[in-house]
Amino acid sequence: MANQPVRTLPPAGAIQDEREIEAVLAVLRSGDLNIGENVARFEDEVSTVLGKELGVMVNSGSSALLLGIGLLDLEPGDEIITSVLTFSTDVSSIVQLGLVPVFVDVEPDTFQIDVNRITEMIGPRTKAIMTPNLMGNCPDWDVIRAIADEHGLKVIEDSCDVLDTRLRGSRIGARSDISLTSFAISHSLTCAGNGGLVAMDDPEMHDKCLTRRRWGRRSESYLYGSRKGQDTRWGPLDDGTMYDQIFIFDDLGYNFEPSELGAAYGLVQFAKLQEFNARRQHAFNRYNDLLVNHTDKVILPRTTPELETTWMRYGFILRPESGYDRTDVQNFLEDRNVQSRMVWTGNILRQPGFSGIEHRAPADGFPNADLVMSHALCIPTHHGLGSDDVGYVVDTLSELFGG
């Protein structure tokens, strides 16, 4: 039996040192907690990695999803094609905006939308394709972009689970109209616990996103967008009354304001991104090197061809014929202080909050997402794991599956 670790190994975990602490203290000592230089620099850095010219930092990845989808300004009842294996807010954002999700099954070993099943689901009201880079793997975005161009659809890349990906040598965001990401603790880096970002190339869309990020007020594009630096304190209401533009509300907005403290923390984390990703990949490779000897018991995760990425977690499927029960496996791992998780929602239409939503689905259902929902689990690969931690997980898996 493997030696017990000195601590529980959670499915996610951030790491920091004095550099993050000092960056946050510098903002506190300045006495100015408003959106400032740190947010601006962070937006520039992350949008570049996403393959975009412009970025808008927000308070979470879920806020980024709601803002990003909303930027398309679709009509109620319009449709967005998406994966049925996903995270809850990918779909709740679609529904909350009065839109209809059109679901496509996944490839079970990649956990990504089956791009070969997208075209058959396009209908007269379909306006966009939006799907996640689930668990850090990615679908073939070249195929998605080609389908979108053929049918006049917009493309949104949900890259909450991974940052810094390339497909066939180029940033994946080069294929999207909008890309977005998250800085939750479980993700590639964090802004002291949370944060998100919407990225785009269109300056007009950027201004719209800024406006909606903070209450819908007109001043946002003058403070942070294409009109920055213009002397425009006063402006006319529709009836001609001159008014302070900080209190002119041109749109229906939210309060998704990011934190200057979080951005300062995130900039330090961003400088460590390659190190973090390398640590994640090391854990993934160690687990894979072991489980490749047990393919009679498990279906291994498969990275999309010609993709450079870093898996957020190591997900695998227990073969139904193997005799391994998932709950028993998870209890075995957790009894040994290795925490595990499901692969996100599974088939989201089987989740209580989503079973009754308006949607469209293929006639043959979602057999692959159902397989993931019943037999898949994922284990930690996060950059907070040390080499001894990873070795302990390998030993525990070896004990579980017999050497």
Placement of each model-derived feature along the sequence:
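Conserved active-site segment immediately N-terminal to the catalytic lysine
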Residues: 157-192, 207, 247-248
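PLP-dependent aminotransferase class I/II
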Residues: 39-44, 52-55, 116, 128-132, ...
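Conserved PLP-binding active-site segment in aminotransferase class I/II-type PLP enzymes
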Residues: 1-71, 75, 149, 246, ...
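Structural detector of well-ordered beta-strand residues that form the stable sheet scaffold
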Residues: 56, 81, 102, 155-156, ...
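Buried hydrophobic packing segments
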Residues: 64-69, 90, 94, 196, ...
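Hydrophobic/aromatic ligand-binding patch that stacks against planar heteroaromatic rings
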Residues: 92-94, 147, 171, 188, ...
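PLP-dependent aminotransferase-like
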Residues: 70-159, 166
